[in-house]
């Protein structure tokens, strides 16, 4: 790794022709893109020497020992490390920290239960068997950072975006300058929250992110509404339930409405919802894909994404959404299997479009579907291998509908509860 010589270097640090020399770095420098890779390489070597092995599905997660109560886990995010072991094994935690301290300069560590990591607050209720992750401090910081701390929680909107809102690109003098309202940075901060603990704002932030270079007054007001909504609900977060403590809300409504079957695993097997909104974007007529994956009563993965191609039918748009969901299903099955929690049988994928389900069962190259045959055969192959099972649900019970478009208040509140947000 080389760097340009900074001002003030001795005269000898120059080339023959008088140009300033490049310096060869003997170690990584904090802030460079190579630094985190070098740290990860070193950390992996140290953890392997301690008996840990990285997962194939996620190399930032390490395991030691066979699956069970005595298994130890390490999760890393650059230089932030989370160590998990049996609750009563206090000595194991001290030994782990001591071994790391023999290789690295460590900041003060917290012995016991983690209650805060990567700006995420962790709350446990051992009696109720729940664990909650939320980011109230991040919401407050967002409002304060962008001068929106005048927003009051008492008057906050109950939905992040109006369902009838239609936004178009601003042009010319309609574009609001960043000096007046730093739209890109605000939306970027909202996207971070939507990807960590607040899936209920994913659709709204996805729509706002389409106008990073051309926001108008309406876009700025819409962004302000999302921030206002977060301020009013800053204590909310994703709640997960201990196995056997209760039927997850999202699965309970499926059982009640008879498209979840008796005998289906309820706690240890995740279920997936996939949906699409045809021609959602007014300027490009591209559709929006959405999926939600629920485990232990709360979302573990979700997506609200503008499709890269223009779908010519609802069935095509839904197939593209299901393809994205199934790629995530494959990853989670491998991840859980490596942790010794292999999924039993296929994972259920709820879909509200009968045509999309029928096409996967019989992917004939018709004039209407031959241009996306690859995706249809991909889904068919996964069904035949017992990776997932397509199952129909009615539209009013389609949780992923919340990821495709803004919804009215009552519907939004229902979906938010099904996500496990409380």
Pin down the residues of each PLM region.
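Long, low-complexity, charge-biased intrinsically disordered regions
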Residues: 1-422
């Amino acid at each position: 790794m080389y760097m340009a010589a900074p001002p003030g270097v001795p005269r000898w640090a120059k080339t023959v022709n008088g140009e300033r020399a490049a310096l060869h770095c003997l170690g990584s420098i904090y802030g460079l893109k190579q630094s985190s890779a070098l740290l990860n390489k070193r950390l992996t070597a140290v953890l392997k020497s301690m008996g840990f092995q990285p997962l194939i599905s996620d190399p930032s997660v390490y395991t030691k020992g066979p699956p069970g109560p005595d298994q130890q886990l390490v999760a890393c995010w650059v230089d932030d490390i989370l160590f998990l072991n049996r609750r009563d094994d206090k000595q194991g935690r001290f030994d782990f920290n001591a071994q790391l301290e023999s290789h690295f300069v460590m900041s003060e560590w917290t012995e016991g239960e983690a209650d805060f990591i990567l700006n995420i607050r962790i709350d446990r209720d051992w009696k109720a068997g729940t664990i909650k992750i939320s980011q109230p401090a991040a919401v407050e910081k967002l409002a304060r950072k962008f001068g929106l701390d005048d927003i009051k929680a008492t008057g906050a909107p109950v939905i992040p975006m109006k369902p009838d809102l239609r936004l178009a690109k601003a042009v010319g003098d309609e574009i609001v300058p960043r000096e007046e309202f730093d739209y890109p940075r605000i939306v970027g901060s909202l996207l971070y929250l939507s990807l960590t603990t607040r899936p209920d704002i994913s659709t709204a932030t996805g729509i706002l992110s389409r106008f990073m270079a051309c926001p108008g007054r309406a876009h700025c007001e819409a962004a302000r509404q999302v921030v206002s909504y977060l301020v009013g609900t800053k204590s909310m977060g994703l709640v997960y339930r201990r196995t056997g403590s209760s039927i997850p809300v999202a699965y309970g409504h499926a059982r009640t409405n008879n498209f979840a079957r008796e005998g289906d695993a309820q706690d240890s097997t995740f279920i997936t919802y996939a949906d699409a909104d045809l021609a959602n974007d007014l300027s490009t007529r591209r559709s929006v894909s959405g999926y939600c994956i629920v485990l232990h009563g709360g979302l573990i993965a979700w997506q609200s994404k503008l499709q890269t191609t223009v779908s010519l039918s609802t069935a095509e748009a839904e197939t593209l959404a299901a393809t994205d969901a199934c790629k995530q299903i494959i990853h989670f099955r491998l991840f859980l299997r490596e942790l010794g929690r292999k999924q039993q049988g296929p994972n259920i994928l709820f879909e509200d479009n009968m045509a999309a389900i029928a096409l996967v069962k019989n992917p004939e190259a018709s004039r209407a579907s031959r241009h996306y045959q690859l995706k249809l055969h991909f889904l068919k192959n996964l069904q035949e291998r017992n990776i997932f099972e397509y199952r129909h649900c009615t539209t009013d019970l389609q949780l992923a509908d919340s990821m495709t478009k803004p919804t009215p208040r009552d519907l939004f509140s229902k979906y938010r509860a099904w996500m496990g947000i409380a």
